Design a protein with these regions (language model features):
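N-terminal amphipathic alpha-helix/helix-capping segment at the start of soluble metabolic enzymes
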Residues: 4-27, 139
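Hydrophobic faces of well-ordered beta-strands that scaffold small-molecule active sites
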Residues: 10-15, 55-57, 85-89, 108-110, ...
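Conserved anion-binding
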Residues: 22-31, 98-101, 105-146
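Short, acidic/polar
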Residues: 36-47, 92-98
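Non-catalytic positions within long, well-ordered alpha-helices that form the structural scaffold/packing
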Residues: 48-51, 101-102
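Glycine-rich, proline-tolerant flexible connector loops at the mouths of alpha/beta enzymes
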Residues: 54-72, 112
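Alpha-helix-loop-beta-strand connector modules within alpha/beta enzyme cores
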Residues: 65-88, 121-137
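Catalytic cores of alpha/beta
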Residues: 81, 85-107
Length: 146
């Protein structure tokens, strides 16, 4: 019998990528990084083996710099996993969104661009129904776009 919570919510494990490694930032501080693994594909496969039905990736380099540096890891993960993979972090243009959706990602998460260019989000959502998520961060009770 399935646990009751499975009927009401989906728990999605996340991997934060920084310079190709799996990390965790302390309260979003890039100066306080804990490196968990240098092998993102192995980490992702571990979540799948533990029963994950979806995986959430965050490109921290993309989020901070606006430039992707973890595409190799992202592509390798999407290729290796049997479950859907979604990604957020640094997706700030239609071209980048299309590139990510074409590389095998199931969904992409738009943050800053959703606040700065909402018409882009609408256009992408029309072209890719069900594949665009808007993620809004908050800090001290206010929207924190970056």
């Amino acid at each position: 019998m399935d646990p009751l919570w499975q009927h009401f919510m989906e728990i999605i494990p996340a991997i934060d990528l920084l310079d190709g490694a799996c990390v965790r930032l302390h309260q979003g501080d890039y100066d306080q990084v804990t490196r968990f693994s240098e092998e993102p594909v192995a980490q992702a496969l571990g979540w799948q083996e533990q029963g994950a039905t979806r995986l959430h990736l965050v490109d921290l380099d993309g989020a901070k710099r606006g430039e992707p540096t973890n595409d190799g890891a992202v592509r390798a993960i999407t290729k290796a996993l049997q479950v859907p993979v979604q990604l957020g972090g640094g997706v700030r243009s239609a071209e980048r969104a299309e590139e990510l959706l074409d590389c095998g990602l199931d969904r992409i998460i738009l943050g800053t661009v959703a606040i700065e260019t909402p018409q882009l989000v609408c256009a992408l959502a029309e072209r890719h129904p069900g594949r665009i998520i808007v993620g809004i961060d908050a800090k001290n009770g206010r929207v924190a776009p970056r």
